């Protein structure tokens, strides 16, 4: 398999950025296929720290970086991120970055609607980043979205704005909010258009040509499988499909071209925002995981909820996502724990389950059944071979591998790019 698809196997924040960066030096093209600028990732390259939200990780290495049609693009956020990364010495030009001409745009009305819904008093918040991702996807499915290509045609742009505001202004009136001016929105989009259009391209063809010429493509997922709109902990999910199948639909390549699917999973669990979390810890162990793992969101700065590794739910996401191998990250965060617990089943209303139930109410009742493993005193930080790991750490990794029923392809032992133990090369598998 010449290509590799990287997806999160938990609730996001698994360390995909580092692994994508680690793999990208061997890739020719890096492509994003879903989400927006709501999920951030941090790359540590030498002494430089890059924080990206929308741009594919390959940009920091000068790789051709593609934003696929499955991504919703905030044009103002894109320009701001390009400017910020450029100030760190990264060269970003239309030759390096391509945006799908059919990608949906996130507009100011989407951000405002997102915030209005999260702030309402009569409903349960989802815990969104309030960046307009969900409302933009709603308009895409509703066939009224403004897309990148519309910026190139003033007449078409006015028609699209009229159509989308017919819907949104009705919503705004119902929420007690003033209507948005069509002239204002057209003016805002017309102003930003020259900064976006040079990057617009038929990315399906760009990727087809790359694959045809035997270039290696790295498909970069955002968030995680447990936030997938179909397969996640609904309704506490994102608004797109995050599993590997979306790599095809979200870029325009065929399913056979997504290649080796690498699922990223932390050696423990974290979650940002609302929703069920069976193994969540509210004690000193949970606090220690958060402090050691620096568990704060890149985009929002929100503190992440922490818990023990959940083998049940991770096994489920790996199967749904067609994952070939797992990258286990942040093993070093578990250094020093005398006992480490792993969830091996759930109990719901007295019944033992080997999967997460589909219903929101049943998920909230799921109580973890734990298996206790011995911790280790030595350090795993910076380890690059099995010989560098304490014996109990090796046993932990092997037990996780058995429980999730999927090979551990590599282990990450620090934020540093090269601190990786490789067992199975995704590009050669």
UniProtKB/Swiss-Prot annotation:
Report the pathway entry: Purine metabolism; AMP biosynthesis via de novo pathway; AMP from IMP: step 1/2
Spell out the catalytic residues.
13, 41
Q: Tell me, which GO biological process terms does this entry list?
A: 'de novo' AMP biosynthetic process; IMP metabolic process
Q: Which GO terms describe its molecular function?
A: adenylosuccinate synthase activity; GTP binding; magnesium ion binding
Q: How is the cofactor bound?
A: Binds 1 Mg(2+) ion per subunit.
- Residues annotated to bind Mg(2+): 13, 40
Residues annotated to bind IMP: 13-16, 38-41, 129, 143, 223, 238, 302
Q: Which Pfam families match?
A: Adenylsucc_synt
Look up the domain of life of the source.
Answer: Bacteria
The residues that hold GTP are 12-18, 40-42, 304, 330-332, 412-414
Q: PANTHER family annotated for this entry?
A: ADENYLOSUCCINATE SYNTHETASE
What is the annotated role of this protein in its UniProt record? Plays an important role in the de novo pathway of purine nucleotide biosynthesis. Catalyzes the first committed step in the biosynthesis of AMP from IMP.
**Name the record gives this protein:** Adenylosuccinate synthetase
Organism this protein belongs to:
Maricaulis maris (strain MCS10) (Caulobacter maris)
* Name of encoding gene: purA
